[in-house]
Amino acid sequence: LHTNDAPSTLDRLRLMGLPPFNIASSVILITAQRLARRLCACKVPQEIPKPALLAAGFTEADLDGSWTLFGPNPKGCERCHGSGYKGRVGIYEVMPISDAMRELIMTNANALELERQARREGIRNLRQSGLLKVKQGVTSLAEVLAVTND
């Protein structure tokens, strides 16, 4: 199924005519994924204003100075053929179906309610998972913003 995120998958299954009790009893985990370009080793440190980082989804705690924000090297190198990117990296949202989630499915909860429950359970959405890859220096903020919804 193609959906924008893991919680929307449950809506899609309902729209396909599956009864809520069948969904709740048979689905144990949902994964959503996106591919982002991986920064080449020639990556360069980037300066982005704090308000823009917060607007992208970083928290104040994320901006503690313990990591460096990298972007693609504008000139690139031989390995990346001047693009600043080399290869791809997966960004994932993995949502196990908990008992609380099953109850919401049985009551025909919409994707927004399911999303809220997922956050309460500590499940990272695609954007949050992408921002983690940015903090790790694997991909750029621009790339994560391009392939995820906020």
What are these model-predicted stretches?
Residues 1-150:
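Short, flexible helix-loop junctions that flank or precede catalytic/ligand sites
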